[in-house]
Amino acid sequence: MRQQYFVKFCKETDQRAADRDSWKTFSGLPQELELPSAPKQFIQYLEEDNRPQVSLDVDYENGMGISVGRLREDTVYDWKFVGLSHNTVRGAAGGAVLCAELLKAQGYITKKL
């Protein structure tokens, strides 16, 4: 599902380069725990002006990753960008599996004795 997002910061700042680096290096708990269905790199930032595109980027990290691009300044908010994820793989089925893996890894789901 491709969406356009808007971001407004509390303080006036130019975070364009920092934001790109943050997206490129972001790692969450599923990556730290190396869960089986977690993508190795959760977010990929694409520099091209025409990316992300569904036909090229929806299957990033077997559909479990997020593709982000077209970061630009906005007149109403501070920044806007486009985000793309696979609605079925990342959203419904894969998201549920990843949640179950995380619950097991954190000890909320245990083997019944």
Summary of predicted features, one role per range:
Residues 50-113:
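C-terminal helical cap and adjacent loop that interface with cofactors, partners, or active-site loops
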Residues 1-78:
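C-terminal substrate-binding/catalytic lobe of Rossmann-fold NAD(P)-dependent oxidoreductases
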